[in-house]
Amino acid sequence: MMEKLFDRVALIGIGLIGSSLARVLRRDSPGTTIVACARRAETLAAVERLELADVTTHDPAEAAAGADLVVIATPLSAYAEIGRRIGPVLKDGAILTDVGSVKEAVIRDLTPHVRPGVHFVPGHPVAGTEHSGP
């Protein structure tokens, strides 16, 4: 078990990588509030059934509000819109990262929405199988 690093973590996109992160947080960081955001009701229902998150929502801004760490784990094509929606609610000192496979588009699409006081750390975890979803 690791030391609790974050009070609230928002996972925007809860497919293969997002749900893997939720599982690790649930196992290793008890007491961290995990917020899962997805477009599809059936995805959020699976998250709730598997107890991967404490809070579920369809709204990226609702997920990101008050989070210490925000992880974007959606298709790259959604980044600009997600950035536009979450930018105004990111709290001072929050860390914003992603799991996208390329960085030029990530930086281009998210940087305009990251204000001073928010730490933007583009990321790329290596994980996966031929399956998707939680």
Residue ranges of predicted features:
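Short beta->alpha hinge that forms the Motif I/post-I loop of the SAM-binding pocket
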Residues: 39-40, 74, 99
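NAD(P)+-binding Rossmann beta1-loop-alpha1 motif at the extreme N-terminus of oxidoreductases
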Residues: 2-59, 64-65
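Conserved short alpha-helix immediately C-terminal to the canonical SAM/SAH-binding motif I
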Residues: 42-43, 78, 103-106
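Short glycine-rich anion-binding loops that position phosphate/pyrophosphate groups of nucleotides
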Residues: 75-79, 101-102, 126
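Rossmann-fold dinucleotide-binding core
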Residues: 110-134
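Structural detector of well-ordered beta-strand residues that form the stable sheet scaffold
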Residues: 35, 96-97, 121
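A short helix->loop->beta-strand "cap" motif at the edges of active sites that frequently abuts
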Residues: 31-32, 90-94, 116-118
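Rossmann-like NAD(P)-binding element
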Residues: 60-95
